[in-house]
Regions:
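Structural core segment of the AMP-binding/adenylate-forming
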Residues: 2-16, 86-87, 110, 114-191, ...
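Gly/Ser/Thr-rich phosphate-binding loop
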Residues: 275, 297-305, 314-388, 422
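AMP-binding/adenylate-forming catalytic core of the ANL superfamily
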Residues: 126-133, 143-146, 303, 357, ...
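Conserved AMP-binding/adenylation subdomain of ANL enzymes
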Residues: 235-253, 261-301, 316
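Conserved AMP-binding/adenylate-forming core of the ANL superfamily
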Residues: 36-41, 45, 49, 57-102, ...
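Conserved pre-ATP/AMP-binding loop-to-beta segment of ANL
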Residues: 168-170, 190-216, 223, 246-253
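Conserved AMP-binding A3 loop
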Residues: 69-71, 212-236
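Conserved C-terminal "lid"/linker of ANL adenylate-forming enzymes
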Residues: 498-504, 513-517, 531-609
């Protein structure tokens, strides 16, 4: 951290004039973010209907050659809601939704929201055992599947608890051409054709604690956890990000390539558009070479990001038209301090609304003051406490209380659990309780353990430092080390594995690395078979980039925990270990042994991970 990143009073005061001009919207957003009224109708469906009432003919969603007004989009969602109700689905039910980024996904989620049905947003990268787990975990009453993911579902369908009520959206503009559903599926686009386009009365029956959707996060016990994201949390994000932080108008267009099974795309970007009835522009996938062409084509004024996205854009060759765009605001998380200022200057960006939040957490930060190199400011009760990495626990004083860090110091981020900042928890009560620290500063208090190391930089601002424990972030995704270990240990030829994240220079997050003990010598091992197995069982971002071969028993602590800190420090550096190391280079289909020349290339940026 640079001392220049510490926030001072003069810096705060210098931002006041800009904030004053946006004060009404920020006050409104702040009130929404603190709502505790359990009797007031709110949430996604209510917000869409409000946006439709104030800007019915404005563009709500743009995708490829399709442009839907708020009136058209709302009517579509209403037909979906009407049909789902007609087949007996109701408030409190769950529907599994497995569709890639396109309007059909968004209309489905809103249709469910208007009925009080919870949409389980399946990670579209999941396959095999992980997909089975995520699906069965939430006990869905129906599934809505895009054509692009039917094969993934069919591979595991025999192991799914749901045996009927599978619905289908063709991979095309289904409002124009519904297509034909495969055997075993009903074509939802055809089924809803004659349903009511009017707002259902049930929209006004969604309240603070009603579930809106499940978002899956990496589980410390291995497989993903389904996090309940209720209408109240969505409302708070809608106010906190949409009105207070991002502050887009009805003529703004925010572009996102981020997957909608994550909260940054589904909640932050979309809520920022809905707040003042602006437009959401969707891309199916991220393309570094085509990104700015899309921005210009759709006249976008904002975009959503994760750190990897910005790095890829920054690594593109500079062009004379880099500033030929209308972007004034970007919103997301993980923009690296090393490129922050250069990125803004190169592309002519005024505001970086860096944020910090998690799908399950109760504490959030956003860069409302537009400082550099910070996740911003938080109005809610939080604490950054001293943390012992060796013992893997917070430090407590002689009275048994945790100790807050001083300004400039890093520690573990905790969010106080109160009526205004509840922790909604997971589907598993035991997992919920494990995420809570009690008696932190006084008897009876309760705080959510974010698992993140943060630095206090003053005036309620913080910097993200690192992710602790059994997950790490790579390619904009959270990776569960336990999940990857369980998959590795299931491969013939691997006796034991320990997985951790390691830093590669000039990349965001940490790449997966596994120390493995094999049943044969590393020269005889079937690396081709391992790669094929991992591609079948894991999303691409979770496949380890490096393998460290260990022919001895794994080193553990007295409580039989693997000693990962030493492994993380040594990472793939051949000078720090005698172990053979193998690497899966970008574009390659199999691991190869790492040598000094290849390591120098990796460290020097010759390979694009």
């Amino acid at each position: 951290m640079s001392s220049a990143d510490i926030i001072t009073l003069p810096q705060i005061l210098s931002r006041v004039p800009e904030l004053v001009s946006n004060l009404p919207a920020m006050v409104k957003g702040s009130r929404m973010a603190k709502t505790t009224d359990t009797r007031k109708p709110l949430g996604l469906g209510v917000a869409i209907e409000h946006a439709t009432s104030i800007n019915p003919n404005g563009a709500a969603v743009l995708y490829q050659d399709t442009e839907l007004t708020y009136k058209q989009f709302n009517a579509w969602a209403n037909r979906i809601a009407d049909y789902l109700a007609s087949i007996g689905l109701k408030k409190g039910d769950t529907i599994a939704v497995n569709i890639e980024n396109r309007p059909e996904l968004l209309a489905t989620v809103v249709g469910c929201a208007k009925l009080g049905i919870c949409a389980a947003l399946i990670n579209t990268s999941q396959r095999g055992k992980v997909l089975i787990h995520s699906f069965n975990l939430v006990n869905p009453k129906a599934a809505i599947v895009g054509a692009e993911l039917v094969d993934a579902i069919e591979e595991v369908r025999a192991d799914l608890d749901l045996k009927d009520n599978f619905f289908y959206f063709a991979d095309q503009d289904t409002l124009e051409n519904p297509g034909d559903a495969p055997e075993g599926y009903k074509n939802l686009a055809t089924e809803i054709k004659d349903c009511s386009s009017e707002n259902p009365a049930s929209t006004k029956q969604t309240f603070l604690k009603d579930p809106l959707f499940y978002i899956y996060t990496s589980g410390t016990t291995g497989l993903p956890k389904a996090v309940v994201f209720n209408h109240g949390r969505w409302e708070k994000a809608y106010g906190g990000f949409g009105f207070s932080a991002v502050r887009l108008g009805k003529n703004d267009r925010i572009y996102t390539t981020l997957p909608f099974y994550h909260a940054t795309g589904m909640v932050v970007c979309w809520a920022s558009a809905i707040a003042n009835a602006g437009s959401l522009v969707i891309a199916r996938k991220f393309s570094a070479s085509g990104f700015w062409d899309d921005i210009r084509r759709y006249n976008c004024t904002a975009f959503g990001y994760v750190g990897e996205l910005c790095r890829y854009l920054h690594e593109q060759p500079e062009k004379p038209n880099d500033q030929d765009n209308q972007i004034h605001t970007i919103v997301g998380n993980g923009l690296r301090p090393s490129i922050w200022k250069d990125f803004k200057q190169r592309f002519g960006i005024d505001r970086v609304v860096e944020l910090y939040a998690s799908s399950e957490g109760n504490v959030a930060f956003s860069n409302v003051f537009n400082f550099d190199n910070t996740v911003g400011f938080s109005p809610v009760s939080y604490a950054i406490v001293k943390y012992d990495k060796e013992r893997e626990e917070p430090v407590r004083n002689s009275n048994g209380n945790m100790i807050k860090v001083k300004r400039g110091e890093a520690g573990l981020m905790l969010g106080e659990i109160t009526d205004k900042t509840p922790f909604d928890g997971y589907t598993d009560p035991e997992k919920t309780e494990k995420s809570i620290f009690r008696d932190v500063f006084k008897k009876g208090d309760a705080w959510f353990n974010t698992g993140d190391m943060m630095r206090d930089i003053g005036f309620r601002h913080a910097q993200f430092v690192d992710r602790l424990g059994d997950t790490f972030r790579w390619k904009g995704e959270n990776v569960s080390t336990t999940e990857v270990e369980q998959i590795l240990d299931g491969f013939d030829g691997i006796q034991e594995s320990v997985v951790y994240g390691v830093e590669i220079p000039n990349t965001n997050g940490r790449a997966g690395m596994a120390q493995v003990r094999m049943t044969c010598s590393h020269e005889e091992f079937d690396y081709q078979g391992l790669c094929a197995y991992l591609k079948q069982e894991l999303p691409a971002y979770a496949i380890p980039v490096f393998l460290r071969i260990n022919e001895q028993e794994m080193e553990t602590t007295g409580t039989f925990k693997h000693q990962k800190n030493k492994l993380k420090d040594q990472k793939y550096d051949l000078a720090q270990q005698d172990n053979p190391v193998y690497v899966l280079l970008p574009g390659e289909s199999c691991y190869q042994r790492l040598d000094e020349e290849t390591q120098k290339g990796i460290d020097g940026g010759a390979y694009r991970f």
